[in-house]
Structures are given as C-alpha cells and as structure tokens.
Amino acid sequence: MTKTADAIIIGAGVIGAATAFELNKLGYKTLSIDRNAEAGHGSTSGSCAIIRVHYSTLEGTAFAYEGYFYWRDWADYLGVKDERGLANYRETGCLVMKTSSN
C-alpha cells in the first residue's frame, strides 16, 4: 500500500501544527514530522504563551489584533464541542512601560 501526502511539514509545534491544520481545512493531505513523540513538546512547550498586540509596527499590531479574536473563540475556530485538551485562554491585561530608549 502506497501512502502519499500533498505536503510534508517539518515540526509539530505551534507553527507546524497550525500549518497542517490550515492545509487540512483546504483539503490537502499532510504528514507532520517532529523529533519529539508528541506535538507541541519542543520549544512550544517552553513558551510563556503570551498573546499581545503591542508591537513596534502597525502591520505587526494589526496582525496580532486579528489573531486575538481567533484565540478568544478558539474552540469555535477549531470546530470542537469538547474543550478538554484545548489551551486555556484567559485575559489578564498588561502593563506597557515607556522609557526614553523605546
């Protein structure tokens, strides 16, 4: 039996998993390859998982602001009914410090 994939994705962290998810939604068959036994157990697992919209460019800020709405409604975006296993999203606010060097 021969198995084929339309795309091979190296890495199954946040970027690789998101790429595979979006390609699958478009109908592509994907194969994800990662050095770890489970997805998200590389550098993604060490992330502090901060979602922010404060960036130095308008484009970066606009992109992050759009992403905020995906995170806020993550279960709906993924189309899951059972939220077990999903990343918890909690808004806590932030404090941005302005100094003479920034």
Q: What function would you assign to each model-found segment?
A:
Residues 1-15, 31:
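Beta1/beta-strand and adjacent pyrophosphate-binding region of the FAD-binding site
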Residues 1-2, 24, 89:
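Short, flexible hinge/linker loops that cap or flank conserved catalytic cores
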Residues 2-8, 40-47, 51:
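Accessory recognition modules or surfaces
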Residues 24-44:
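Glycine-rich FAD pyrophosphate-binding loop
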Residues 48-102:
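Dinucleotide-binding Rossmann-like beta1-alpha1 core, especially the glycine-rich loop
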